[in-house]
């Protein structure tokens, strides 16, 4: 495994730095930002972009990922989709897949940035790339490349009565002792509207301050 060069810098405002990173991502094919916001964690923020290598799979995915990691032994960013469960257990669900994403997608970034407190550290196989990209970040002005999204009308996939019925079934299972906690996700969609994902992420993150905020762009 090749070692990465590292260099650290100081920032004044993390939120402004996040906006610069999101603006920078417009010109990147592979980009991920993981933001802890104000929650205590090992890193306040992790970011990776560019691609040295990648893996995507919808069959025997975990074994392929394990082999990929053993080969690279480096930073890998990506996701495991909900339907990966169907590779582990014999499961059949009738959920409609409107996105058709692979069950697993990970990439090895050309450069990694992490933030802890007021210190930003860059990691790269090319020493000059860290300084060059840092200069690019500081040349980016707010909303330089991203534009505001138009107002989008969101629709629920299920009716209110269907939603209440599912919540009641979840409560029954909790009362029965099948589980003590359950995440219930539901679909909000818009069929014909276009949004600016960069501007939308910044606005949503500033509003929610989610402890597991993420922005991912692949290919």
Where are these regions (language model features)?
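Extended alpha-helical targeting/anchoring segments
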Residues: 1-219
